[in-house]
Amino acid sequence: MEDRFEIGRIVRAKTISDAWYRGLNIIRNHGQVITDERGSQIREFMDLMIIIEDPYTDRIPHETAWNEERLEEYAKQLISGENTQDFEYTYGQRLRNWHGKVDQIDYVIEKLQQNPTSRRAIAVTWIPPVDTKVNEVPCMMLDDFKIRDGKIHLTTLFRSHDFGGAYPANLYGLSKLLEYVADKVGTKPGTITTISISAHIYDHDWDMVENIVKGVN
């Protein structure tokens, strides 16, 4: 593990599980320990970009605390916009009913149906009039969909990314969302790229991560 500050890595991973293991390894070995604004101690690596070539096989890492039932419910809420557990917000609500006005996923589908080479098929979660005044704000900020080489590819930006606890669920849900959009547009789902501005592991997950990354290159 290093204490010096380092910023920026690009990783090409085969699957979601591969992406998780390699991301954890980078944060564990090259991240810097800081105390965040809530007083939590984290090990953080900034600007971590991971390209997942096949996010549809080996979606659930063996070591994650998320089981398939919970992951399916997470994906369902992401795609449908439902909030059955009365959270302050869900990503699905922000994507399907942004500020009570816009279904951004419908917009993405229509945009790509009308113009397959569009660079405007984007959905955002941040609502400035709301999120500048509350404590609970989205970590996932932007989903960008592009059709290239006969497939829809998704690039997702996270301002803050809990790699130890949330990455497997985030990517499981995003892979299901990409499959949904691809089906509606009538093309094949492609790669998923995550850009994590603050990729971090909370101190309560350090021991777990230590065991997971043994043997990871």
From Swiss-Prot:
Q: What is its main location?
A: cytoplasm
Its localization reads:
Cytoplasm
Gene Ontology MF terms:
thymidylate synthase activity
The question of whether Cytoplasm is a record keyword is answered with yes
Active site, renumbered? 139
Q: Which domain of life is it from?
A: Archaea
Query: EC number(s) per UniProt?
Result: 2.1.1.-
Q: In which pathway does it act?
A: Pyrimidine metabolism; dTTP biosynthesis
Checking InterPro entries in the record gives: Thymidate_synth/dCMP_Mease, Thymidate_synth/dCMP_Mease_dom, Thymidate_synth/dCMP_Mease_sf, Thymidylate_synthase_arc
Gene3D superfamilies, A to Z: Thymidylate synthase/dCMP hydroxymethylase domain
- For the protein in the UniProt heading, the enzyme class is transferase
Q: Is Cytoplasm tagged as a keyword?
A: yes
Q: Which PANTHER family has this protein been placed in?
A: THYMIDYLATE SYNTHASE 1
Family label: Belongs to the thymidylate synthase family. Archaeal-type ThyA subfamily.
Record's function text: May catalyze the biosynthesis of dTMP using an unknown cosubstrate.
Database matches in NCBIfam families: thy_syn_methano (TIGR03283)
Give the multimer and partner information. Monomer.
Protein name as catalogued: Putative thymidylate synthase
**Source organism (scientific name):** Methanosarcina barkeri (strain Fusaro / DSM 804)
